[in-house]
Amino acid sequence: GFDVVDNIK
C-alpha cells in the first residue's frame, strides 16, 4: 500500500 509495509503483493 504505502511505502513497503503492505507492498508485498
Curated annotation (Swiss-Prot):
Give the species. Answer: Cycas revoluta
Q: Which GO terms describe its molecular function?
A: lactoperoxidase activity; metal ion binding
Q: Where in the cell is it found?
A: Secreted; Secreted, Cell wall
In Swiss-Prot or TrEMBL terms, this protein is called Peroxidase 1
Grouped into one coarse class, the protein's main location is secreted
- Supply the EC number(s): 1.11.1.7
Gene Ontology BP terms: hydrogen peroxide catabolic process
Presence of the UniProt keyword Heme in the record: yes
